[in-house]
Amino acid sequence: LGGTLCKIGSPLLSFLLCSLCTPLQAYILNHYSTEADYPWADTPRAAVFRHASNRKWFALMMEVPRDKLGLAGTEKLDIVNFKCDPILISSLRGETGIFPAYHMNKASWITAALDGSVPAETIELLLNVSYELTKPKPRRKAAKGKENE
C-alpha cells in the first residue's frame, strides 16, 4: 500500500516514511482522485490533500508530539486536519481523539487523531465535509444585459 500511494522520493523512502498511508489516504485517492502532496522538505511526513482546480487544502495529515495537543507525553501522534463548519466543530469538542486544529485556524479547522480513537465514520464525515467546504464555487451567471459590457 505504501509504495503505491506515497510519492516521497524513492520507493524505499516512501515505504519507510509511510505510516500515514492509511486507509484514509486510500479513501481519498479512490473517492476524490487526489494523491498526497508533500510540500515541505523538512517535514516529509506532512501530506497535504488539495483540490486540483483551486489548490485549496481539504486535509492535512501529519505527526505531532502528543503534548502539542494537550495530551500527556511527547511521543508522536498521527493526526489529520479538516476544514469544518464551526457548529460541527463545537458539537465535536470533548469527543475522544478530536482536538482544536493544530497549526490551523481553530474557528474553521479541526484535528482528529489517527490512532483509532475517532470512529472511521466520523473521520469519513469530516473528510467529506472538508472536501465540500473547500471545493470550487460555481460561477454566477452574468446579469441580463451585462454579458457584453
Each predicted region: which residue ranges?
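Charge-dense, helix-prone N-terminal extensions
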Residues: 1-149
